[in-house]
């Protein structure tokens, strides 16, 4: 009887302890992932959405990386407004943005190794930035500083190019070039998304193949020595910075948006991949590429490139954990995520 009584007491104590643990407000803390919702499905035939930018009026511009020369323009509710055919161009379009001062619509033509000025109504294009030697370049993403200068990442040369507010012709020397902006990893893209902190004193650059964010100190428009800011963002792709200097990064190999503070401490991991519908449409994030905020900053829009790396790199052996899923995609999407998230408790 004493042994039974002791067992009962022990069981009661264990259960009480477990109940207390489970009821503790911080015991089950986890990332509040803010489910990625469908914003828009590209029209039939539209594939590989990569670049994304929100216009001053709130419209969402989405560039395709499929050779079609297409940019799709959606309203803030995801309704298709028009389809632009960017001409002349190679059709392999990546980063895009609206100049904060001139309001020029700039689009990277990856295939031609240049940056274009594009008419946002007609799609007519002209050169904005050209390189003296475009062969071997990998122009990918762009951003602006307070003076209106334009900065363009080069994934293959491990560099960032710079022009003034009106562009440049025949650039020969990158603004900065460094081994930390190159990669031998996978996906095989080095310098990618980039953005300045609010003080304009640091340019942050994602390195996709290295899973890193690199910080470049800036003084008087001149680049300092790059250094690794933070590691382990799986496939760090597009990158933007909010008004609190938090850094939002599309992690294209883990199908999530990673948010860090200005010290590199992770604050949130948002979104996830939730499989495909019967018609081959992704639920949630699948190879998220380029994020941007809505005008009121309450929503994050992000393209789902859904790229099969075996096809994208031309190497059948280049299998990623999402390859079997991306191979089944029939309809490409843009997602939206609520930017208000519950921060983890910080004891």
Regions flagged by a language model, labelled:
Residues 112-149, 153, 157:
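Asp-box/WD-like beta-propeller blade repeats and closely related beta-sheet repeat scaffolds
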Residues 44-59, 87-105, 132-150, 180-202, ...:
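Beta-rich, blade/repeat-based domains predominating
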Residues 292-347:
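Blade-level signature of beta-propeller repeat domains, shared across WD40, Kelch, NHL, RCC1
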Residues 65-66, 110, 155-156, 165, ...:
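Short loop/turn segments immediately following the C-termini of beta-strands
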Residues 68-71, 113-115, 158-161, 211-213, ...:
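Structural signal for beta-propeller blades
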Residues 61-63, 107-108, 152, 205, ...:
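Residue position within the beta-strands of beta-propeller blades
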Residues 74-79, 119-124, 164-168, 217-222, ...:
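Short loop/turn segments that connect beta-strands within beta-propeller blades
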Residues 30-46:
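A short helix->beta-strand "capping" segment at the edge of beta-propeller domains
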